[in-house]
Amino acid sequence: MSAGREQFVRRMRASRSAGDAFDVVLQRGTELGFQFCAYRLTAPIPITRRRTFVWSNYPNACAASPVLDADRSGRGADTDAQACGVTADATQVFESMADGLWAETSDQGVRYGWALSVRDRWGAVGTLKFARGTREIVQEELDDIEPEMIWLAHLAHDTIGSLMRDETIPGEIARVSLVERQILLWTAEGKTVSEISSILQMSVRNINFHIQNVVGKLGATNKTHAAVKATLVGLIPV
């Protein structure tokens, strides 16, 4: 790792809050030639009401946009987890005038940009966007700066995701035991309690005991719901 990257990593690791970490990324984005930066973190659960946190220096007029959900405080909530417009680990270069998804931001000076979404082992998705109002991103420039932006997106998600873990992943999830994860794995495979008992060589009574415990830890209503939530937060497969 270069000395410059090592220094940047130290600054990120020294961040005491997600907002502090975002400010470090914002500064680097400016150095790369972008006026605007936004980072969006979407929690994996609740499944139908996923919480979203956004840090941004986008114009205030864009704050109401369901696409950007730009809230500098980081406390904005948007239940549309697909609004980021990109899939995990796939970069997107956009021109707002040409792309309906971003068109409403062009009048606010946000026209050309780049975005990447990263999904972590807990199922949380972080989307980093860099944008500017003038000068299209040409291939020559992209070849030069995209490796750095991809690295920034992963580092931003690693840092901000960790700082926001208590907000995105309920603490009880970390206490799910290996046996409970194995039971949920076989539940997800459609096995009955009796079949799981035979597979794990445990009594039906013990299986039911562990199911009751893990359903409570995951805040689920039944074992099927627990298996779905466990899959989304990366607890299974084991």
UniProtKB/Swiss-Prot annotation:
Residues 193-212 bind DNA. Keywords: DNA-binding, Transcription, Transcription regulation. Disruption phenotype: No production of thailandamide antibiotic. When the promoter region is disrupted (121 bases before the start codon) thailandamide production increases. In 2 other promoter disruption mutants (617 and 624 bases before the start codon) this bacterium no longer inhibits growth of Salmonella in an overlay assay, suggesting no thailandamide is produced. InterPro entries: Sig_transdc_resp-reg_C-effctor (IPR016032), TF_LuxR_autoind-bd_dom (IPR005143), TF_LuxR_autoind-bd_dom_sf (IPR036693), Tscrpt_reg_LuxR_C (IPR000792), WH-like_DNA-bd_sf (IPR036388). It holds the Pfam family Autoind_bind. Residues 169-234 form the HTH luxR-type domain. One of its GO terms (molecular function) is DNA binding. Disulfide bonds: none annotated. SMART domains: HTH_LUXR. GO terms for biological process: regulation of DNA-templated transcription. SUPFAM superfamilies: C-terminal effector domain of the bipartite response regulators, Pheromone-binding domain of LuxR-like quorum-sensing transcription factors. Represses thailandamide production. Belongs to the autoinducer-regulated transcriptional regulatory protein family. Thailandamide is a polyketide that is toxic to human cell lines but also has antibacterial activity on E.coli, S.typhimurium and S.aureus. It probably acts on acetyl-CoA carboxylase in the fatty acid synthesis pathway, which is rarely found to be an antibiotic target. These data suggest it might be a good starting point for engineering of novel antibiotics. This is Transcriptional repressor ThaA. It comes from Burkholderia thailandensis (strain ATCC 700388 / DSM 13276 / CCUG 48851 / CIP 106301 / E264).
